[in-house]
């Protein structure tokens, strides 16, 4: 059991019989009463995000998870296939289990497979990934004066804003936590 005041981003807890990843946790104190811990939790299996407020001092069970290095192999329909690097066993995860991580998966990339009681329930991505720009507006001389950026579509279907100097075919780094452009690869 872990006290809700000690919850941090990235931790896994069990709430309502389901495993959740803590996306945000902040403390709010009211006048005379005890504090309130506001959390944003993501269901590991369904990918749904919900906001839950816990009274300060409450305790929740921490999920017992294990992580194994794996390589993303391919997608077939609604399933994504991974191979663990230690024993070369293959696992399939559904699109629901993968969630938005599907926009960052490139064949042969390494990820961490998340296991609960021997069953894969999700993946952990690296902080940044390299993706190729497949669609964006052409740049014109003087575009950089206004600052900002232009929309771009990446090889995985992810739509982000990139600087004006980025062209179709460029490899760029994208932060998997925020979905934002980091730099050229």
From Swiss-Prot:
Keyword Cytoplasm among record annotations: yes
Entry GO terms, CC: cytoplasm
Pathway annotation from the record: Protein biosynthesis; polypeptide chain elongation
Main location: cytoplasm
Compartments where found: Cytoplasm
Entry-linked PROSITE patterns: EFP (PS01275)
Molecular functions (GO terms): translation elongation factor activity
Keyword tags: Cytoplasm, Elongation factor, Protein biosynthesis
Annotated family: Belongs to the elongation factor P family.
Protein function: Involved in peptide bond synthesis. Stimulates efficient translation and peptide-bond synthesis on native or reconstituted 70S ribosomes in vitro. Probably functions indirectly by altering the affinity of the ribosome for aminoacyl-tRNA, thus increasing their reactivity as acceptors for peptidyl transferase.
Protein name: Elongation factor P
Naturally occurring in which organism (per UniProt): Thermotoga petrophila (strain ATCC BAA-488 / DSM 13995 / JCM 10881 / RKU-1)
């Amino acid at each position: 059991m872990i006290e809700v005041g000690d919850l941090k981003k990235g931790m896994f807890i069990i709430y309502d019989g389901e495993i959740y990843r803590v996306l945000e946790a902040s403390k709010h104190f009211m006048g005379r009463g005890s504090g309130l811990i506001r959390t944003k939790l993501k269901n590991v299996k369904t990918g749904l995000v919900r906001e839950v407020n816990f009274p300060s001092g409450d305790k929740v069970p921490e999920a017992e998870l294990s992580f194994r290095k794996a390589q993303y192999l391919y997608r077939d329909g609604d399933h994504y296939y991974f191979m663990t690097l230690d024993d070369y066993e293959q696992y399939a995860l559904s699109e629901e289990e993968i969630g938005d991580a599907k926009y960052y998966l490139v064949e042969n990339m390494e990820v961490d497979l998340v296991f609960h009681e021997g069953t894969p329930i999700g993946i952990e991505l690296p902080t940044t990934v390299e993706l190729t720009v497949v669609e964006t507006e052409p740049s014109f001389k003087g575009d950089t004066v206004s600052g900002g950026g232009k929309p771009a579509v990446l090889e995985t279907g992810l739509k982000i804003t990139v600087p004006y100097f980025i062209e179709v075919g460029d490899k760029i780094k994208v932060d998997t936590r925020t979905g934002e452009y980091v730099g050229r690869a």
